[in-house]
Amino acid sequence: MLYRRQTLSTPHGALETPVLFPVRNIGKRSSDNTPEYTDEIPDLSTAMVNARSIRQREPQWNRIQGGENLRGEMGVSQSTIVFADSGGFDFRSEELDTTPEKSLETQQAIEADILGTVDVPLSRENRERENDRRVEENVQRALTASNSYDGDGLLFASVHGYDPETIRN
């Protein structure tokens, strides 16, 4: 398992892997799914945010476009390493409502260190053909993002499932 230990260089500092990225909602005024332990770990230097939620929150998005800094606005350290998931898939509607370009624009505006590409999750309940289609579309969106991206952060392609068994397969 030592092969998983690496050091990633990000715009806001070095990151030793493996690493925990708790959802900290630094891009969201509420804390409905921020784990309680995030306040108990004084040196927790990572956070995961949802780029789509930030972009859809018009007052906040306008402030960021006007030059506000997300880390400062939300009261976290400037050295916090932020992973910004695209957030493009809405589980309630099961629709994709963003593009790789819009997602990258948002992720770069909030100065994300690690940027996740737009993806649609896989599921054991789906037929293999449907999951294969989703994987292919995710790959194409990742390639579009890669071809469009010229920033300093790390662009990670996202393909995932609902559970560990789906991910392993």
Language-model-detected regions and their locations in the chain:
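Non-catalytic, usually N-terminal nucleic-acid engagement modules in DNA/RNA processing proteins
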Residues: 1-150
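Glycine-rich phosphate/ribose-binding loops and adjacent secondary-structure elements
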Residues: 148-169
